[in-house]
């Protein structure tokens, strides 16, 4: 009867010790020790080797409970006064992200921890106008310790520098700074509906027109200064060539005039000879066939001129042709660069035309002068 009572008390002590250790892990060790002492006292009354084994098993169970609850030991130390809970909180808290993307006032702000001084730097980008190349240039300009910086997509494909920031932030990407790679996960943003997209395009066009209207005067002044400077440069290059051209032109003009007067003298001499032979030396009956052949020979000469020059024999055209012949002969003799002279003249004419168009009343937003249709 006494042995049964001792066994029941032992079972109750085991169950109460387990409940206490599970509910109050901080007191698990003391409860196990108390239970072990109580068991040893009961084993002395029983006097059996089996009870000693049970007590040893309870001590082993107490040790298992101690090693299975590391938080209980830390909590017990915390109750003793050491700030282990703060250390545990620091070890368990996640590390700050090196690269993050947030939106502030509608603009993406990329925060990057620079490798030189390990400081976070924020880069505010314009999604519509900035590109990946602009962002990479800003990174290298901010930290001189960055030798290589590239951006890759999530599948490892390199993203071109001309890609827009709005396209880049649509999906995850990898930012590689020197030998360190960062996985960037930008926040998701809903795409605009079709109607809102059209309104946004209209706003873009309106802003561009407003910018053009406000900057048109400054642009025209800068363009006018540029054209005037170009004209001055071209004129300075043309001036020495113009002097040589004037000398050659005068010589060619003088020789052409001599040729014209020589033709006039030839025709006058021919008229005098034919008149002398017709009325003083011979009669008209004899000179008529001669004058016919002279006229026919002159017609053949004019036809030969057309065959050679592909131009009709007209006095102004013949005179200009003779002038050009004399001019080119003089240019070849003096090594005058006619091609360069013509290019400079064309460039000056084009610049003057652009300047005239720039100063047009329509370009300056001035009222147009009305055409007076009334007759005097």
Curated annotation (Swiss-Prot):
GO BP terms: actin filament organization; calcium import into the mitochondrion; calcium-mediated signaling; chordate embryonic development; convergent extension involved in gastrulation; establishment of localization in cell; glucose homeostasis; mitochondrial calcium ion homeostasis
Region (N-terminal MCU domain): 99-189
Catalytic reaction(s) noted: Ca(2+)(in) = Ca(2+)(out)
Region annotated Juxtamembrane helix, chain positions: 309-314
Any single Gene Ontology cellular-component annotation: uniplex complex
Role summary: Channel-forming and calcium-conducting subunit of the mitochondrial inner membrane calcium uniporter complex (uniplex), which mediates calcium uptake into the mitochondrial matrix. Mcu channel activity is regulated by the calcium-sensor subunits of the uniplex micu1 and micu2. Mitochondrial calcium homeostasis plays key roles in cellular physiology and regulates ATP production, cytoplasmic calcium signals and activation of cell death pathways. Involved in buffering the amplitude of systolic calcium rises in cardiomyocytes.
Family the entry assigns: Belongs to the MCU (TC 1.A.77) family.
UniProt name for this protein: Calcium uniporter protein, mitochondrial
Record organism: Danio rerio
Gene, per the UniProt record: mcu
